[in-house]
């Protein structure tokens, strides 16, 4: 099945969406924050405020398709990234907190290869997904590690690579009646 938003519509390749927790009381949408010694917001976090949609994100598949094909990995980035970021696209980097989802201040060749994949969750709401991180191993792309939340010492809800408690998300089209 192709990727669909909360209203059951196909997710558009290159389209702009909010990523929200499927249970309203578990925080808000996804956004960038300045953490640690960062001088600008490069860390991808979940808003602590349930009423916040976060920032709109863009989902882009390498396939020339108007929608996101089933099972394909894709790039995810902010539609309006901070000006200090070298690219809008998310990447995964090693931090003191483990593997974390971030924006980079300086462009690297590896950043262009970072891919993610939504995996459908068994839920009464048919449109709930986990987000997986995809790693290249030899010629294969393995998408077997989840993206979850880890609170840091200052209370930021950072998106990290984990095998425990994956984040369960819905996609809401930016500027849709559901937002």
UniProtKB/Swiss-Prot annotation:
Per the record, a Pfam family? Kunitz_legume
Q: Which cysteines are joined by disulfide bonds?
A: 40-84, 134-143
- Keyword Cell inner membrane in record: no
Please provide, alphabetically and separated by semicolons, the GO molecular function terms listed in this UniProt record. Answer: serine-type endopeptidase inhibitor activity
Sites of Pyrrolidone carboxylic acid modification = 1
Annotated positions for site Reactive bond for chymotrypsin: 64-65
Which key words tag this protein in UniProt? Disulfide bond, Protease inhibitor, Pyrrolidone carboxylic acid, Serine protease inhibitor
Q: Give the record's family classification.
A: Belongs to the protease inhibitor I3 (leguminous Kunitz-type inhibitor) family.
Q: What does this protein do?
A: Inhibition of chymotrypsin.
Name of the protein: Chymotrypsin inhibitor ECI
Q: Which organism is it from?
A: Erythrina variegata (Indian coral tree)
